[in-house]
């Protein structure tokens, strides 16, 4: 009988993934990561629900303490980024360093199981010609989470299974109800797992970064208003600026050194090109010449056609890894340092990386 570990968060998606594999005849074992050092939605109600699901399915349940790993790779990563005036993307970082890697290692080293499954909406194929696993968008484009998986290596993809990739969300809930899962009607979480259910990202960051009031200025340096902490803002933001103007204003830059938020019109918040670092080539080997693909610069943004020019590794900054230049075919709004740029050919995710702060 094939053995597999299912990462259980306590939500309907991971619960249904476990139930599907269990009913397909897999020998399933549930695994829940203990992420937060304090109270949080992901490690209270979620852990209890995950344990209940394992009891319902009559499968073992393992809890792995990854609190220190989560603190170092996610919390500290966020705080460092926001302090520097960028907007980090914790989910892709978490998937690689806290979830998939540690789960696969635990399964192989402790349980003798070399496959893991999650409730992510994504698909995997194997291309024998290139000897590579191809990461693809889910059938349910509205729920597709491949964007957050761009940083997974071939090693991690080879050990991963996504049972929900061919399903739409309504089908997931229907199957959960058919199996009588407790989580069938559980609402989806609307926040990052590290944001306490009664709080917000702003409140979370304020625990680690002391807010300092400063000036909101235009590109010419004219003072238009006051802000309550640079780390509360992100590129492209319009709401919550508290600045009166004859036309809409957007955040176009952040200067934490001078404690200033710079605003401008919408055109000032658009770009025709960007540089991306720490690139992970997923479904293809690193190209030696430019390629054309559809690039997504935020999770919910529409893909834009672009030429992707390989820059290789900067010998002066090897820590930035493989870099590329993106030349867009049309202006793109709100390109934000710290977020991921991910490129696709059709449904196939070719690669992705972190948008550089090009100051």
Curated annotation (Swiss-Prot):
Where are the active-site residues found?
Answer: 94 (nucleophile), 193 (cysteine persulfide intermediate)
Q: Which Gene3D superfamilies match?
A: Adenine nucleotide alpha hydrolases-like domains, HUPs, Translation factors
* Reactions listed under catalytic activity: S-sulfanyl-L-cysteinyl-[protein] + uridine(34) in tRNA + AH2 + ATP = 2-thiouridine(34) in tRNA + L-cysteinyl-[protein] + A + AMP + diphosphate + H(+)
Q: Name the CDD domains on file.
A: MnmA_TRMU-like
Keyword field: ATP-binding, Cytoplasm, Disulfide bond, Nucleotide-binding, RNA-binding, Transferase, tRNA processing, tRNA-binding
Q: Name one GO molecular function term.
A: tRNA-uridine 2-sulfurtransferase activity
**Disulfide bonding pattern of the chain:** 94-193
* Cellular component, GO, one term: cytoplasm
Localization recorded for this chain is: Cytoplasm
Where along the chain is ATP bound? 7-14, 33, 119
Residues with site note (Interaction with tRNA): 120, 339
Name the domain of life this protein comes from: Bacteria
Q: Return the annotated region ranges for Interaction with tRNA.
A: 143-145, 298-299
Q: What is its main location?
A: cytoplasm
Gene Ontology annotations of biological process type: tRNA wobble position uridine thiolation
Q: Which Enzyme Commission number(s) are on file for it? A: 2.8.1.13
Q: What does this protein do?
A: Catalyzes the 2-thiolation of uridine at the wobble position (U34) of tRNA, leading to the formation of s(2)U34.
The name of this protein is tRNA-specific 2-thiouridylase MnmA
Q: Which organism is it from?
A: Trichodesmium erythraeum (strain IMS101)
Q: What is this protein's gene name? A: mnmA
């Amino acid at each position: 009988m094939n053995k597999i570990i299912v990462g259980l968060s306590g939500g309907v998606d991971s619960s249904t993934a476990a139930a599907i594999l269990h009913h397909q005849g897999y020998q399933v074992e549930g695994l829940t990561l203990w992420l937060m050092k304090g109270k949080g939605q992901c490690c209270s109600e979620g852990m209890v629900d995950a344990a209940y699901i394992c009891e319902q399915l009559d499968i073992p349940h393992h809890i792995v303490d990854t609190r220190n790993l989560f603190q170092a790779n996610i919390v500290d990563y966020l705080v460092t980024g926001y302090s520097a005036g960028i907007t980090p993307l914790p989910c892709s970082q978490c998937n690689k360093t806290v979830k998939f890697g540690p789960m696969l290692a635990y399964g192989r080293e402790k349980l003798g199981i070399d496959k893991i499954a999650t409730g992510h909406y994504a698909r995997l194929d194997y291309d024998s010609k290139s000897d590579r696993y191809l990461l693809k968008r889910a059938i349910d484009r509205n729920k597709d989470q491949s964007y957050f998986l761009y940083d997974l290596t071939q090693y991690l993809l080879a050990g991963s299974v996504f049972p929900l990739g061919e399903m739409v969300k309504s089908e997931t809930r229907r199957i959960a109800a058919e199996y009588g899962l407790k989580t069938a009607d559980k609402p989806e979480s609307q926040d990052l797992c590290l944001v306490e259910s009664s709080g917000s990202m702003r409140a979370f960051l304020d625990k680690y970064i002391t807010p300092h009031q400063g000036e909101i200025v235009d590109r010419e340096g004219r003072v238009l208003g006051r802000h309550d902490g640079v780390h509360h803002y992100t590129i492209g933001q319009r709401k919550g600026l508290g600045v009166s103007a004859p036309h809409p204003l957007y955040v176009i830059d952040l200067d934490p050194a001078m404690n200033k938020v710079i605003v401008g019109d919408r055109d000032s918040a658009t770009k025709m090109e960007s540089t991306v670092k720490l690139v992970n080539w997923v479904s293809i080997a690193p190209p030696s010449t430019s390629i054309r693909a559809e690039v997504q610069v935020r999770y919910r943004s529409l893909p834009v056609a672009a030429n992707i020019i390989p820059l290789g590794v900067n010998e002066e900054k090897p820590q930035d890894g493989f870099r590329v230049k993106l030349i867009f075919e049309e202006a793109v709004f709100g390109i934000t340092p710290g977020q991921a740029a991910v490129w696709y050919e059709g449904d196939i995710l070719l690669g992705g990386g972190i948008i550089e702060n090009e100051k």
